[in-house]
A protein has these predicted regions:
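Short, structured beta-strand/loop micro-motifs enriched in basic residues and often containing a Trp
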Residues: 8-17, 37-40
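A residue-level detector for short acidic-glycine micro-motifs
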Residues: 14-17, 34, 48, 61
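Short, Lys/Arg- and Gly-enriched loop/turn segments at beta-strand edges
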Residues: 38-46, 65-68
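Terminal peptide-recognition signature
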Residues: 21, 29-32, 57, 101
Length: 154
């Protein structure tokens, strides 16, 4: 069973002092909806979308009002944004029932996040989480190929 990813925005958890984002008036708690008109699904995609000298950010405030901000920058210059989560559209979870699943074999009483049966290739790339590749959509494989995402832990 494949999970449809929902469109979400990246919730901004912090804005670094004296950064491009702070100078543009972006605040913690606001949401990044798009870069140059393209919806952003995760911090990996964000890094590709902002690698330009001029970008247009679509930001949503706490009252659901959107505004566009034009930022001129060096191609490798960071915006100074930090996000609540690395993926903005929800984590893909594993629906397999493998007898050898290490998550199912963990002892009780550990921290909650260890019991999440994530199967998200983005978390594999970012944090070294293991994935099965069985819960992926065609677009996921295309994104891996397009961005040369490696290593992935299978």
């Amino acid at each position: 069973m494949l999970v449809e990813r929902k469109t979400m925005q990246g919730i901004i958890s912090a804005v670094r002092r004296n950064s491009l984002a702070e100078n543009a008036g972006i605040k913690a708690g606001e949401k990044l909806c798009a870069v140059n008109g393209v919806s952003v699904h995760d911090i990996i995609e964000l890094s590709y979308l902002v690698a330009d000298e001029q970008i247009v950010l679509t930001i949503e405030d706490s009252e659901c009002r959107q505004r566009q901000i034009v930022i001129e920058k060096y191609t490798d210059e960071e915006l100074g944004l930090e996000f609540e989560a690395a993926v903005f559209d929800g984590v893909t979870t594993c629906y397999n029932n493998c007898v050898f699943c290490f998550v199912d074999q963990m002892i009780p009483g550990m921290r909650e996040s260890l019991y999440v049966r994530d199967d998200d290739y983005r978390l594999s790339f970012l944090y070294g989480n293991f994935i099965t590749l069985t819960n992926m959509k065609e677009e996921d494989f295309e994104q891996i190929i397009k961005t040369h995402m490696s290593p992935l832990y299978i």
